[in-house]
């Protein structure tokens, strides 16, 4: 991903057939902000005619905004808020349209489960599909799905090298090389990254990672194309678990205050190998097949700051003691996935059909070991000691092995009645079987529980929508869809990282549905796309504590989100590009258990109002300027008493680029240029401040 960086670019023209192939292979990487097509083969229609809110962050947009992580990219999407890391999960933890989506990460249409912080070095776009989508993706997707579209080999020559240097000791080098091979229709592509940075205005936290992603394509421009790819991302970072909550709000201390130990760590290693086959039998019949093996390894020792005792708003802050709650663990996840999709276009009389049907299989496993530290020295709220880790002992609290087998089949038909009306109907059948073995221990090592659980969930989900196109440039739609959340959705029955309880183990899946009424328009000769949608998402049987069986949950709750989304992307004029939007989310715990007092309150980590925009101007000779803003409303980290809330905030960014020549460009990105203190990632036990004012300088060279 080309954030601010030194770029070395070479493009050479080849034969006419190769030029045609370039157009085919790069339709998703428009040189602006208006992406017209999804990378997902399950969608047969352009985004303009797809009856769902889909926000695509183009490579160009992420480049202009200087995004260096997937979280940087997701902050540009209204309706998304970020959660902080916890004991059993680190990495990307977004909430989409009111519901947590950390298990709804996909890479090129296949599940990307790993608990790791994703880097966009090998991505050409990030697609956010909003609303329940189990008919397309299987389990999960209550609020939506995030799909990462990888860079693919092309028929042209590309040579790029990025070097970024900036605030907080940021040094980032990434490269993109694409080379057509002597065999006609073949090409090799290689993407690399090495990234080191601390967190601006946060002492202690830092990130170190590298990544490599080679890919080989055979048959570019032919009826049959085979693509082999591999991606490795390895990190060794010091985690940031932020500040403690004090009297219901983030601790009143300088934002750089760090409560962790100087040798805390999170180490992750993601290895993803993929084989993809695309074959066109003719213009109306296409086969897409993928086979993937992925392994995700993780080890960590993290420190969470917790207030010792009862602290009120009247407690002198200089007397507050902080307990360092230290968790340690390691895990390995393995995933073997296969997909086969068949796309067919045909007619029945005067009615046209675009049908996608397919099958999916997967074997997934997870083997975590979780420990806590006993006898950890405490510290003070105002002056935490920056020392190496020490403890009396490490105590294993849980070991688990989870193996899941899934099988799915689906069919989706877009039925076209003339040029004005389309009807989309689809269904998917999922078989999700989980085998779990777990051992739990108390804080002194005694066995607290040994479980062997086998559970099979069989679910059918549906999707239907009606689209009306009064003119070619505009569409109105009304859609309905469903999704489900099984108890082992995250490859574990451990539902509580505090007591390691298996409170959801014997429950049927949660059921979700969504209704969305929207409209999409292309204006200014197709340069700018405008979208608006009204929607309602209902989780009809949310998990709540079972009053009759302590330690277990019951499907007796209900959660709702009613909302509005407004989005635009593209160009106001040839020299003005814009991307932005607004989301209004009215979330509610509509029904809760008798042991809770949160009925009627908003859902966790949901801002009622979020807003984001970015404007880029290239009308000044040799100069390019960009500016943007982001607003996130108040959010709750806990909605039962005592309530924990983080205040609303604004953040402003800017970019300046100067073209010294056609071959040399200098660039600077400034993030949070007002140095706003805000809280970016929430958790019921801690809250992480956002980055302070920072600048990254870059040099771009092309020839």
What kind of region is each of these model predictions?
Residues 278-292, 296-304, 477, 506-571, ...:
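Membrane-embedded beta-barrel scaffold of Gram-negative outer-membrane proteins
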Residues 536-538, 554-640, 674-677, 698:
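Gram-negative outer-membrane beta-barrel transporters
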Residues 217-221, 333, 352-354, 360-364, ...:
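Structural signature of Gram-negative outer-membrane beta-barrels, strongest in the C-terminal barrel
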């Amino acid at each position: 991903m080309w954030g601010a960086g030194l770029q070395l670019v070479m493009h050479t023209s080849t034969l006419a057939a190769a030029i045609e192939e370039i157009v085919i292979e790069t339709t998703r990487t428009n040189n602006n902000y208006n992406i017209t097509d999804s990378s997902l083969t399950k969608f047969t229609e352009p985004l303009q005619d797809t009856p769902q809110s889909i926000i695509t962050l183009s490579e160009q947009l992420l480049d202009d905004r200087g995004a260096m992580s997937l979280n940087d990219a997701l902050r540009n999407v209204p309706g998304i808020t970020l959660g902080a890391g916890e004991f059993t999960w680190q990495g990307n933890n977004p909430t989409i349209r009111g519901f947590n989506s950390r298990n709804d990460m996909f890479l090129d249409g296949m599940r990307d489960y790993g608990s790791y912080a994703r880097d966009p070095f090998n991505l050409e776009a990030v697609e956010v599909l909003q609303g329940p989508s189990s008919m397309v993706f299987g389990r999960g997707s209550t609020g939506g799905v995030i799909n990462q579209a990888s860079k693919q080999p092309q028929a042209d020559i590309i040579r790029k090298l990025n070097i970024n240097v900036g605030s907080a000791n940021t040094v980032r080098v990434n490269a993109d090389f694409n080379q057509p091979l002597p065999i006609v229709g073949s090409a090799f592509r290689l993407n690399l990254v090495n990234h080191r940075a601390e967190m601006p205005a946060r002492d202690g936290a830092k990130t170190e990672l590298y990544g490599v992603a080679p890919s080989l394509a055979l048959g570019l421009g032919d009826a049959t194309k085979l693509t082999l790819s591999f991606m490795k991302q390895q990190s060794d970072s010091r985690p940031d678990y932020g500040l403690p909550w004090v009297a219901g709000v983030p601790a009143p201390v300088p934002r750089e205050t760090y409560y962790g130990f100087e040798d805390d760590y999170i180490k992750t290693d993601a290895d993803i190998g993929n084989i993809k086959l695309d074959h066109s039998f003719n213009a109306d019949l296409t086969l897409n097949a993928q086979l993937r093996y992925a392994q995700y390894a993780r080890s960590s020792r993290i420190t969470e700051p917790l207030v010792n005792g009862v602290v009120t708003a009247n407690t002198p802050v200089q007397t507050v003691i902080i307990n360092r709650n230290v968790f340690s663990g390691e895990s390995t996840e393995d995933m073997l996935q296969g997909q086969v999709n068949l796309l067919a276009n045909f007619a029945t009389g005067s009615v046209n059909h675009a049908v996608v049907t397919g099958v999916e299989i997967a074997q997934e496993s997870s083997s975590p070991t979780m420990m806590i530290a006993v006898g950890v020295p405490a510290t003070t709220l105002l002056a935490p000691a920056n020392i190496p880790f020490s403890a009396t002992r490490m105590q294993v609290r849980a070991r688990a092995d989870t193996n899941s087998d899934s099988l799915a089949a689906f069919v989706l038909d877009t039925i076209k009645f003339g040029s004005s009306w389309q009807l989309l109907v689809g269904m998917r059948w999922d078989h999700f079987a989980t085998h779990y073995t777990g051992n739990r221990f108390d804080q002194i090592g005694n066995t607290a529980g040994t479980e062997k659980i086998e559970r099979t969930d069989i679910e059918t989900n549906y999707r239907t929508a009606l689209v009306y196109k009064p003119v070619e440039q505009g569409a109105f739609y009304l859609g309905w869809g469903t999704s489900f959340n099984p108890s082992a959705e995250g490859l574990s029955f451990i539902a509580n990282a505090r007591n390691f309880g298996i409170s959801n183990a014997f429950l049927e899946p949660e059921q979700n549905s969504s209704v969305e009424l929207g409209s999409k328009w292309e204006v200014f000769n197709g340069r700018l796309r405008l979208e608006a949608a009204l929607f309602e998402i209902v989780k009809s049987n949310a998990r709540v504590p079972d009053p009759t069986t302590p330690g277990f949950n019951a499907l007796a709750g209900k959660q709702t989100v009613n909302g509005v989304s407004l989005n635009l992307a593209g160009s106001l004029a040839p020299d003005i590009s814009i991307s932005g939007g607004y989301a209004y989310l009215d979330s509610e715990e509509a029904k809760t258990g008798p042991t809770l007092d949160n009925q009627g309150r908003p859902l966790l980590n949901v801002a009622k109002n979020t807003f984001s925009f970015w404007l880029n101007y290239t009308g000044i000779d040799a100069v390019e300027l960009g500016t943007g803003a982001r607003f996130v409303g108040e959010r709750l980290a806990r909605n039962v008493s005592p309530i924990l809330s983080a205040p609303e905030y604004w953040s402003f960014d800017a970019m300046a680029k100067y073209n010294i020549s056609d071959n040399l460009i200098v660039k600077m990105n400034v993030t949070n240029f007002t140095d706003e203190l805000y809280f970016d990632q929430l958790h019921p036990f801690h809250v992480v401040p956002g980055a302070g004012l920072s600048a990254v300088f870059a040099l771009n060279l092309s020839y």
